[in-house]
From Swiss-Prot:
Widely expressed with highest levels in muscle, nasal mucosa, salivary gland, uvula, fat, liver, heart, placenta and pancreas. Moderately expressed in the lung, small intestine, kidney and brain. Lower levels detected in renal cell carcinoma than in normal kidney tissue. Higher levels detected in oncocytoma tumors than in normal kidney. Higher levels detected in renal cell carcinoma tumors than in normal kidney tissue. Phosphorylated by AMPK. Residues 203-220 have a biased composition (Polar residues). It comes from Homo sapiens (Human). Residues 544-911 are annotated as: Interaction with PRKAA1. GO terms for biological process: intrinsic apoptotic signaling pathway in response to DNA damage; negative regulation of transcription by RNA polymerase II; positive regulation of protein-containing complex assembly; positive regulation of TORC1 signaling. Residues 12-32, 93-126, 203-237, 585-632, 645-665, 747-800, 875-900 are annotated as: Disordered. The lineage of its organism: Eukaryota, Metazoa, Chordata, Craniata, Vertebrata. It comes from the Eukaryota. Homodimer and homomultimer. Heterodimer and heteromultimer with FNIP1. Interacts (via C-terminus) with FLCN (via C-terminus). Phosphorylated FLCN is preferentially bound. Component of the lysosomal folliculin complex (LFC), composed of FLCN, FNIP1 (or FNIP2), RagA/RRAGA or RagB/RRAGB GDP-bound, RagC/RRAGC or RagD/RRAGD GTP-bound, and Ragulator. Interacts with PRKAA1, PRKAB1 and PRKAG1 subunits of 5'-AMP-activated protein kinase. Interacts with HSP70, HSP90AA1, STIP1, PTGES3, CDC37, BRAF, GCR and CDK4. Binding partner of the GTPase-activating protein FLCN: involved in the cellular response to amino acid availability by regulating the non-canonical mTORC1 signaling cascade controlling the MiT/TFE factors TFEB and TFE3. Required to promote FLCN recruitment to lysosomes and interaction with Rag GTPases, leading to activation of the non-canonical mTORC1 signaling. This is Folliculin-interacting protein 2. PROSITE patterns: DENN_FNIP12. It is found in: Lysosome membrane; Cytoplasm. Residues 468-1040 form the cDENN FNIP1/2-type domain.
């Protein structure tokens, strides 16, 4: 017998290469090759579905395994015809000729896609063989150790290394009716193929992957909030709900009608942070998709059977053997996970319906045939959707995102966009088609609204700064939320009230015209640009890398010499950790980044890192010196005056210090259990290591002057070995101790220095505090290239003269601010001693190369991403964007938000507070982290570049924007897709309405289809759009300006001003409607001058800042 179609489907080694060749022929050419995934690495037929049941009486049983399904060819029915086999047209996703038994595989792409209706009334014949040998092990992985009594769902992701597979599984508690309260009749139908005495147990002999593979869990099933429970249920199941990865990111908001959900972009992010933070307690998630229904809703439930069953659904993706291909698919999978979960829920609904329906069939063989065919159909639809999402051609350079990413060719980009924009206005707006399309897009894709909010700046500055938002950037650091979630919500326009999810499809046979429309719309479909931070754990560092000495702490049990008890011995080993380079290192540093001649510590002393501590902690008692600060990155809030820790404190100790420059040491803070190296020994070691040739410039250091402008360093983590209190809980006591020590340092000193400081306007701006000016040992800031000639003028240090020291501080500040003025009073001794100090600092034994904690000053402009860390003194160069010292995560430099008035005030207050009292600044020195590398490259690993697609061969449901040549599949699938979007929203928050904008360039019509309104006319997909006069006048004015040959950036600024005008009109409308319950449209026209055709647009805009407007007018 010739190999069956299903055998070819699942025979990976035999068919993967040829199926890749077949798939290559069926694909449309990419619009930007670098902006999609390689389809040859992904075979959609290698997606496997397993349905498992766990019953407290009958144990675990496999209800379905797609690997065990084989198609029985109906030779008699199709002997003379060479037509494609149709597994309900949904499973195949393509065509394969039956007559040639050697035909390699089904082609990857069918013209009708994955949702066409049944081509044949009669069910295809399937043979369900014995499930594969690995199902027992996979069942163990799916169910895990969750108790049967636990209600709610759990979701897990496993990566199986051999063969490489990615498994996503979701376990539901079964909900059953009384008369049909089991799947026994379905299971009995399977008994002749599924009987296995070992089912329900992990049979390692049958386990093709070996017993050890069960431990390959990625541990992604993070416990989150418990579902709300009824009164009759027990409350002590002892497990947190673990429903979905995206439920960690996405939780419910207040109801759309409440005023607290006035969903501005900023407020949505703040709410997301509140609802996902464990500090705020557990907020129940919505209960849909939590249970698996095994009976129709009309069945009455039987309480005795409530806890008896769990159903697990698992999707397994077989990965390519190549590592790069595996990495590509994993990138795709995890960056698009909310979409995967949404489609998995849709698959679950289809399985529920199949199970319920098949019970009504009396004959066992027909029941199995019906059940298997329905599941294969649903699996085929899932495969097709994932394939489409993976292989769709993307728009290479979306206009708004490319403008935001700080491209150097911004002017050319503006010119190209304006050229395309005005061409469309001239060509396709004669019958108001383009104006209608833009009206619909601005009405439903509302993420543009926060970008045009006024930002108290002159227009030209407002335009250049619109890319970024300080307040959102600060929010992302202080109240973390998932930026992918924020980006997805912005793209779908889900920031109004009530919440709508919107997609736009442009239909037309003229491919060039459709592509041009899609390109122009990417300016109005706005979202955040994401900056990705990646950790590189590699110990091998490149030639130009700066290295920090990290520490590896090893604990071991050793028996005591006298007592019989055992002691925990902590060993600290220094290991290098890479740090992203701030500025190019000098030649000396590049060839010898670390001193190699530091002598070994004598036996008996603990070899610890010599960390630098801020002066605030300099007087700490030795017992408190065990804080782990091995290679601290100085927080910008820390004072820049330094003392040797526990070695030279106070004037009387200065007398004991050696009289050369070596007395100014970095603090000898010890990392470990409290032992200290002898201070004199440290001095001796450091004197041995005085460099013969001083480097040209010292290592990078934060500019003191810039501290006045940057945000406070908010997230510092200090590990204290042997300390039970968290750093936060110890904060107040440490503050008190510090204040006492400040007072003890000498009031007269404070007074004299304050007088000196007041005499010099430069010094008065200094963040340094009187009382910390003693024993200054501060390396000079690395300045920009032009300042190298003056780099030796810095902190002169003279024990006898306080005035000179204050003047030196002023001089240093003037350099750091690039003022170009000469240093005030930095004498020759100062320069000489500074050299000695710098030499000590650079060559300190195992001393860390200090790197400033990322300043995070947001230099908002065309070349920089918000939240970028700008190296000090290097403003004119291109900066390396990265985040150090934080837990690496994507940071949202939110395009969809300009500073609104109150936010601008808030950030101004933060900046004011920064230049004021610095006593509450950061006390901790950060531990070295592995290299955190920020990636600002344009890729499709975020929704902004992935869901804005080009001209596709068929309609695709997930995409925010795409074009297609035919609306045939659109008509078939649109209604079901809109309903699915409402029931299984990818944002996982309650959605009031799902909307699809359909622009047909063949019929010159723009319609809006919605999940709420049924269309009575069969010829139409939705309601026609009412063209806004505001949008029409905007298009005409842009066209006139362009024809007058005004500069492109001026035209775009005018466009932004007109959009802002719409926003301000919506504010006016909301203010007028405040307190009203009903208002007549004519009244609005008379009082506010708002035309009736502008009302839908202005109402939608107003819903982003005033939710009550929609309730009054809709």
């Amino acid at each position: 017998m010739a190999p069956t179609l299903l055998q070819k489907l699942f025979n990976k080694r035999g068919s993967s290469g040829s199926s890749a060749a077949a798939s290559a022929q069926g694909r449309a050419p990419k619009e930007g090759p670098a902006f999609s995934w390689s389809c040859s690495e992904f075979d959609l037929n290698e997606i496997r579905l397993i349905v498992y049941q766990d019953c407290d009486r009958r144990g675990r049983q496999v209800l379905f395994d797609s690997k065990a399904v084989q198609k029985i060819e109906e030779v008699t029915a199709q002997k003379t015809e060479d037509v494609p086999i149709k597994i309900s047209a949904k499973c195949c996703q393509g065509s394969s000729s039956v007559s040639s038994s050697s035909s390699s595989s089904i082609s990857s792409h069918s013209s009708s896609g994955g949702s066409s209706h049944h081509a044949k009334e009669q069910l295809p014949k399937y043979q369900y063989t014995r499930p594969a040998s690995d199902v027992n092990m996979l069942g163990e992985m799916m169910f895990g150790s969750v108790a049967m009594s636990y209600k709610g769902s759990t979701l897990k992701i496993h990566y199986i290394r051999s063969p490489p597979q990615l498994m996503i599984s979701k376990v539901f508690s079964a909900r059953m009716g009384s008369f049909c309260g089991s799947t026994n009749n379905l299971q009995d139908s399977f008994e002749y193929i599924n009987q296995d005495p070992n089912l329900g147990k992990l049979n390692t002999n049958q386990n093709s992957l070996g017993p050890c593979r069960t431990g390959s869990n990625l541990a992604h099933s993070t416990p989150v909030d418990m579902p709300s429970r009824g009164q009759n249920e027990d409350r002590d199941s002892g497990i947190a709900r673990s429903a979905s990865l995206s439920s960690l990111l996405i939780t419910p908001f207040p109801s759309p009608s409440s005023s607290t959900s006035s969903s501005s972009s900023y407020q949505r992010r703040w709410l997301r942070s509140q609802t996902t933070s464990l500090e705020n307690g557990i907020i129940p998630r919505r209960s849909t998709d939590e249970t698996f229904s095994l009976a129709e809703e009309t069945c009455s439930s039987n309480p005795a059977m409530v806890r008896r069953k769990k159903i697990a659904i698992s999707i397994i993706f077989s990965l390519c053997e190549k590592e790069e291909a595996q990495r590509n698919f994993q990138d795709f999978f995890f960056s698009h996970f909310p979409l995967f979960e949404s489609h998995m829920n849709r698959l679950k609904s289809a399985i529920e319906k199949a199970m319920i329906s098949c019970r009504k069939i009396a004959e066992s063989s027909l029941r199995v045939q019906f059940y298997v065919s329905r599941l294969m159909e649903a699996l085929g639809e899932f495969r097709g959707t994932i394939w489409n999402l993976y292989s769709v051609p993307r728009i290479a350079e979306p206009v708004w995102l490319t403008m935001m990413s700080g491209t150097l060719e911004k002017n050319q980009l503006c010119q190209r966009f304006l050229k395309e924009f005005t061409l469309l206005i001239e060509q396709i707006n004669k019958n108001q088609f383009f104006a209608a399309l833009l009206t619909a897009v601005l009405t439903y894709h509302l993420a543009w609204v926060p970008t045009v909010m006024p930002v108290d700046h002159p227009p030209i500055k407002a335009f250049s700064e619109k890319r970024t938002s300080q307040s959102v950037n600060m929010l992302a650091k202080t109240h973390p939320y998932n930026p992918l979630w924020a980006q997805l919500g912005d793209l779908y326009g889900a920031i109004g009230s009530p919440v709508r999810l919107t997609r736009t499809v442009v239909v037309g046979k003229q491919k060039d015209l459709v592509q041009r429309i899609l390109y122009v719309l990417t300016y109005f479909l706005r979202c955040s640009e994401l900056q990705e931070n990646q950790l590189t754990w590699s110990g091998n560092h490149g030639e130009g890398d700066q290295v920090l000495n990290g520490s590896k702490i090893i604990t071991a049990l050793e028996k005591g010499e006298v007592e019989e008890s055992e002691y925990v011995v902590i060993t600290v080993r220094n290991e290098p950790a890479l740090v992203p380079p701030i500025l190019p290192p000098t030649a000396a540093e590049r060839h010898n980044p670390w001193p190699t001649g530091f002598p070994e510590c004598p036996e008996g002393t603990d070899s610890r890192d010599l960390g630098l501590k801020p002066d605030k902690e300099a007087n700490r008692r030795p017992e408190q010196g065990s804080e782990a600060c091995s290679a601290g990155c100085l927080g910008p809030a820390s004072d820049a005056s330094w003392k040797p820790q526990n070695a030279f404190c106070g004037d009387e100790k200065n007398k004991e210090a050696p009289q050369d420059g070596s007395s100014r040491l970095p603090s000898c803070e010890v990392l470990g259990a409290g032992m200290k190296m002898d201070q004199q020994a440290v001095c001796e070691l450091l004197k041995v290591e005085m460099p013969t040739r001083l480097p040209d410039r010292s290592v990078a250091w934060p500019c003191p002057d810039r501290h006045l402008r940057e945000k406070p360093s908010l997230e510092k983590v200090t590990f204290q070995i042997g300390s039970f209190a968290s750093p936060e809980s110890d904060f107040e006591s440490r503050m008190k101790k510090m204040e006492e020590r400040v007072k003890a340092c000498g009031p007269s000193l404070e007074a004299s220095e304050a007088a000196d400081v007041a005499q010099d306007p430069q010094v008065s701006r200094s963040p340094f505090k009187p009382g910390f000016q003693e024993n200054v040992c501060c390396p000079q800031n690395r300045l920009s290239e032009g300042d190298e000639g003056e780099s030796d003028k810095g902190f002169a240090e003279d024990r006898g003269s306080r005035n000179d020291m204050a003047a030196d501080i002023a001089g240093q500040l003037s350099h750091a601010a690039d003022l170009g003025t000469a240093s005030h009073g930095a004498g020759g001794t100062g320069g000489r001693r500074l050299e000695a100090t710098r030499g000590l600092y650079v060559k300190a034994a195992e001393g860390p190369v200090l790197e400033p904690v990322a300043p995070r000053c947001v230099q908002r402009g065309p070349g920089l991403v918000a939240g970028a860390n700008i190296p000090c003194g290097d403003d004119n160069k291109k900066a390396n964007f990265r985040t150090e010292g934080d837990i690496p995560r994507n940071e949202s430099s939110d395009s969809a938000l300009g500073d609104s008035d109150d936010e601008a005030c808030a950030s101004a207050m933060l900046d004011l507070g920064h230049g004021g009292d610095r006593t509450g600044g950061s006390l901790e020195v950060e531990l070295p982290l592995p290299r955190s590398q920020s990636i600002s490259t344009q890729n499709v690993r975020n929704f902004g570049r992935s869901l804005l697609a080009g001209y596709c061969p068929t309609y695709m449901p997930d995409l925010v924007l795409h074009g297609t040549g035919s609306d045939e599949k659109l008509k078939q699938c649109l209604v079901a897709d809109l309903v699915h979007t409402v029931h299984h929203p990818v944002l996982d928050e309650p959605i009031a309405e799902a909307v699809c904008i359909i622009a047909d360039t063949d019929k010159w019509s723009v319609q809006v289809a919605t999940s709420q309104r049924k269309v009575t006319d069969n010829m139409k997909l939705g309601q026609d759009v009412l063209v806004s006069s505001q949008v029409s006048s905007l298009l005409q004015s842009i066209l006139q300006l362009y024809k007058l040959h005004l500069p492109a950036d001026f035209c775009i600024m005018h466009l932004e001003d007109r959009l802002q005008e719409m926003y301000l009109k919506s504010k006016m409308l909301s203010e007028y409607l405040r307190g009203h319950t009903r208002v007549h449209v004519k009244e609005l026209g008379v009082v506010l001058g708002i035309e009736s055709n502008d009302l839908p647009l202005l109402t939608a805009i107003a819903s982003t800042h005033s939710p009550y407007v929609a309730q009054i007018l809709l």
